[in-house]
Swiss-Prot record:
Residues 559-570 have a biased composition (Low complexity). The keyword Zinc applies. Keywords: Glycoprotein, Hydrolase, Membrane, Metal-binding, Metalloprotease, Protease, Transmembrane, Transmembrane helix, Vacuole, Zinc. Zn(2+) 1 binds at residues 156, 168, 226. Residues 37-359, 413-428, 483-496, 649-668, 714-976 are vacuolar. Its main location: membrane. It comes from the Eukaryota. CDD domains: M28_Fxna_like. This is Vacuolar membrane protease.
Length: 976
């Protein structure tokens, strides 16, 4: 019996037991979190156990070291060196394989001219035409069953001008090489195409060019490897549908990592990035976008280097892609279910998938069945007189305490906005922790204050029922969102899981009441309110408790007395000050009322019909009331808390650094933090009012620490820097001044940093900082002249870009007023790969340009010196982007056709039609090499000294990236 007494004491609903169980729960969640984030680092293949995998990893790491030795954007000569190295490696791997073929776009001089929407801004109405000369390297491995739909594996080998491209996308490229090496040894059943593509960074152009290749007709599926962060684990960022998600589930058995929350966030444009997967998806392919996703403040900076990543990160991407490609290459695929997928992994051990449409149907079932069951059980318990009636004060305690916590949270968020709005960039844990502790602490204080004056029995069960009602409302709203989005809101699944488990807990309580001991009188109110100065328990309840005490066996007497003492000791209403209302929360009884209620019989041992309850029935009731809370706790707290915490962490981990990208992103991150902390708090709120003083003291202490860290600590450090965008602009139409543009977040960050630069503080250079859109700040100053070319004389910037008008018939008398105007330009640019022409008419709202022609020079076909590509657009063309490979080819030859104003508005009475038909052309040409030198008058000088100065003298709490596709932009303008 002593063991039983200990067991009952440990499991009884007491403050200490509850607090200990909460501690254990959160400790387990913390350990699982650490395990999830660290386990992949311990799974590298060992040479003695997996020699083939070890060789693939070591070879890939060596390849990565070579291709990330320098910056290699499309606009640099280093880009060609990376291309040549990859081509050499591809030829080495394929060797004399009978089923392998290699195609080099650079050798075949492949180019495309096409119209595209801005791939990084879907809301843009700017009509863009792009000319691109490709240097993609494609490899075809013909499968044993070539009639099966093929698989494309893709990664891009260009970097941005300010990054080495280790993660973006060097790891993807060397993973493709490893996959190629593996499949050469293990011939696939279906045909595989490998696309080592170029110039993803400035328009996803390598992927677009793929569909100009005849091999594109062989592939239906795609695995795109990308890096939109700087290391960590490679996540299944998005996938086409439920079928492809299940293929990932079936193939990636070791260290799966994916979450459809990322997919919803990406499609909702909370992340301002894109990958080649967008192009493949738009062209009807189905597949998987596997990418690194954090941290974004190192993404596209000098820290995207091999020093800031690891073999563990490389192996995670390589092994994931290898498992997936091997499965797809060798198995028949079930691709019937093309509805969007909800998916997530459990600490890298198990991957779960459900169709978003199926989830919606289940939500509908939950929404319909759960209230019917709950109401039915309520009616049964009321009919059996086992329902405990609650006052309106009792019903409002839980929701009002939750509302008060949200209000306090909102007030605190206002303090964050005023004092430290970018704090999430440094560490999102502290603000989330502050929000979370605010909610639970406010709930604790209000519920216990209410219970002090108006005691309520069974507050826990009432709160669980109210939580069920709140979650039912939330699930109704989210289900509507899921349906209206055509099932693309794939990140809402955690709420369905939370609702299901909370519903089970609430139904169990209602079921216990419905099946409870029947009485002949309705139970009175269980909660003392301001309308009554006595407890209104029915006589039957009190007599029944008395009978229970009389009928207990003698050998259980000591245990029973201990239990009763613990109940009174832990009661939420017992206090040393104020009214002494000792409410037995499990038995629904105010012990003090027994002395004052005239309905209480003088003899508790009365043998009346109402008191004739068996010892067995009372024992069962006591057993339920003692231990049922554990079942409710285990249903509501551990699993929902882990899933909700993990979901919030997933969101914040991907988005916290986006606060640097504008005030809108800052608001989004703050909003996600507030809502996320409420969701994390909800599972424990029905229980938290009963924790002991140590737990609540630690909660208050954690809030004070979190709040101070959130409000007072500087948001940027060496490991979490502020990312600033750089460009140096030279407008030849306004002189040769080399104006440096530095773009970053408002908040007195940029100007103090710039004022400390030697070239500024020793020359009194003026810095002009102005606010631009979306909470950003642009600072401009005249910087040191760039040295873009090697020369034996003085560098003349004006000679870098020259525009020659070869033909223009706007004022020709031979042209009819109704005839389109035609002009031909020769754009002379030295050692350049990228330029942009922008067309604008001062007298027409839309661009009048309807046709663009690009005249190409083919090195392999000198007899066909001018090969033309032409594109037409009825809606007008605003911009022409030019990308060429040959640095020695110093000209772009362009033809432009535009409509006269007479054709667009039909105003024949306008006497200035000639002037109104003028077309303004703005030219911008880009240079992206900075980590190299030019030789000027026999002396080696840095190409972009203004950028070098920023890198060398700015505090380590700043990182730098390019504002546009080049670091130096030379501009000019003409009127045709």
């Amino acid at each position: 019996m002593k063991l039983k007494s200990v067991f009952r004491s440990v499991l009884k609903y007491r403050k200490t037991n509850l607090s200990l169980l909460l501690l254990i729960t959160y400790s387990i969640i913390t350990l699982l979190y650490i395990f999830d984030h660290e386990r992949y680092k311990l799974n590298l293949p060992k040479e003695d156990e997996h020699p083939e995998f070890n060789d693939l990893l070591e070879t890939a790491w060596g390849d990565l070291q070579i291709i990330t030795a320098s910056f290699h954007p499309y606009t640099s000569k280093e880009n060609d060196k990376v291309h040549d190295y990859l081509l050499k490696r591809v030829l080495e791997i394929t060797g004399n394989s009978s089923f392998a073929s290699v195609s080099d776009d650079k050798e075949s001089e492949r180019s495309i001219l096409f119209q595209q929407q801005d791939p990084f801004n879907e809301s843009s109405r700017f009509s863009r035409v792009t000319y691109f000369e490709s240097s993609n390297i494609l490899v075809k491995l013909e499968g044993k069953n070539p009639e099966e739909e093929g698989l494309l594996l893709s990664a891009h080998f260009d970097s941005v001008p300010t990054g080495y491209g280790a993660t973006d996308d060097g790891m993807g490229v060397v993973s493709l090489l490893a996959n190629l090496k593996y499949h050469i040894k293990h011939r696939p059943n279906r045909t595989l195409i490998f696309n080592f593509n170029n110039n993803e960074e400035f328009g996803l152009l390598g992927a677009s060019t793929y569909f100009d290749h005849s091999w594109s007709n062989l592939t239906k599926y795609v695995i795109n490897l990308e890096g939109t962060g700087a290391g960590g684990k490679a996540v299944l960022f998005r996938t086409s549908d439920t079928s492809t998600a299940r293929i990932y589930q079936q193939s990636v058995k070791e260290n799966p990592f994916g979450n459809s929350i990322y997919q919803q966030g990406f499609y909702s444009r909370y992340v301002r990035s894109e990958t080649d997967y967008k192009i493949y998806e738009e062209n009807g392919m189905r597949g998987w976008d596997v990418a690194f996703y954090k941290p974004r403040n190192l993404y596209h900076t000098i820290k995207d280097s091999i020093q800031y990543t690891s073999k563990a990160s490389l192996w995670h991407m390589l092994h994931t892609s290898l498992q997936l490609s091997a499965y797809v290459a060798s198995n028949s695929l079930d691709t019937a279910d093309q509805t969007p997928a909800c998916y997530f992994d459990f600490i890298g051990l198990k991957f779960f998938v459900i169709s978003a449409k199926t989830l919606f149907y289940w939500n509908c079932i939950f929404l319909l069945v759960s209230p019917v069951v709950a109401i039915g059980l309520y009616l049964i318990s009321r009919d059996r007189m086992t329902w405990k009636s609650y006052s309106w004060l009792s019903w409002t305690r839980f929701p009002l305490s939750l509302a008060a916590g949200i209000i306090v949270q909102k007030l605190f968020s206002n303090d964050i906005i005023r004092s430290n709005p970018l704090t999430f960039s440094r560490n999102y844990f502290w603000p989330i922790s502050a929000f979370f502790t605010q909610v639970i602490f406010t709930s604790y204080v209000l519920i216990n204050c209410s219970n002090f004056f108006f005691p309520c029995a069974d507050m826990k069960s009432l709160s669980i029922i109210e939580l069920f009602i709140i979650l039912w409302t939330i699930l109704l709203f989210t289900s509507k969102l899921l349906y209206s989005s055509d099932y693309r809101y794939t990140g809402l699944y955690p709420l369905s899981i939370f609702f299901l488990l909370s519903t089970i807990a609430a139904i169990l309580r209602l079921l216990a009441l419905a099946l409870g001991m029947r009485t002949r009188k309705r139970l009175g109110r269980e909660c003392r309110d301001h309308h009554s100065n006595y407890s209104s328990h029915s006589q039957i309840d009190m007599e029944r408790d008395g009978q229970e005490n009389l009928e207990q066996p003698q050998d259980q007497l000591t245990s029973s007395q201990d239990d009763q003492a613990s109940i009174q000791d832990d009661n939420v209403s017992t206090t040393s000050a104020g009214p002494s209302h000792n409410v037995d929360e499990d038995h629904g009884m105010d012990s003090s009322s027994q002395q004052h209620d005239e309905r209480v019989p003088l003899l508790k041992g009365s043998n009346s019909m109402e008191e004739g309850l068996s010892t067995r029935e009372n024992s069962l009731k006591l057993e339920y009331t003692d231990y049922a809370w554990i079942i409710q706790f285990l249903l509501i707290v551990p699993i929902p808390s882990f899933i909700l915490f993990n979901s919030v962490d997933v969101i914040m981990d991907a988005l916290n650094h986006t606060v640097q990208e504008g005030s809108k992103a800052t608001f989004d991150v703050l909003r996600f933090g507030m809502v996320g902390s409420i969701l994390i708090a909800l599972p424990i709120l029905p229980f938290f009012y009963k924790v002991n003083y140590i737990t609540i003291s630690l909660t208050a202490l954690l809030f004070l620490i979190s709040a101070s860290k959130t409000l007072l600590v500087h948001p940027f450090t060496n490991s979490n820097p502020l990312k600033v965008r750089f460009s140096q602009n030279i407008d030849l139409s306004q002189g040769n001044a080399a104006s440096v543009h530095v773009l970053g977040r408002e908040g007195n960050f940029l100007k103090p940093m710039l004022q400390d630069l030697p070239s500024i503080k020793y020359s009194s250079t003026h810095i002009n900082c102005t606010s631009v859109t979306n909470g950003m700040e642009l600072c401009m100053y005249d910087g040191m002249q760039p040295n873009l070319l090697s020369t034996n004389g003085n560098t003349n910037i004006s000679s870098m870009v020259k525009v020659h008008v070869l033909h223009n018939n706007r004022n020709s008398t031979e042209r009819s007023p109704y005839e389109p105007i035609v002009a031909e330009l020769l754009l002379e640019v030295k050692e350049n790969r990228a330029c942009t022409l922008t067309f604008e008419s001062r007298h027409q709202a839309k661009s009048p340009v309807r046709e663009i022609t690009v005249y190409q020079k083919k090195n392999s076909a000198p007899q066909k010196a001018n090969i033309t590509k032409t594109i037409k657009s009825a809606s007008g063309i605003n911009e022409l982007q030019l990308h060429k490979l040959d640095f020695d080819q110093e000209t772009y030859h362009i033809g432009v056709q535009w409509f006269p104003k007479l054709l667009t508005d039909g105003n024949v009475e306008d006497d200035k039609l000639g002037t109104k038909d003028e077309l303004s052309v703005s030219i911008s040409c880009y240079w992206g090499e900075y980590d190299s030198e030019s030789v000027v008058n026999g002396t080696a000088v840095r190409k972009i000294p203004a950028f070098d100065e920023l890198i060398n003298y700015a505090p380590l709490s700043f990182s730098f990236t390019n504002e546009q596709k080049g670091l130096v932009i030379v501009k000019d303008a003409i009127i045709l």
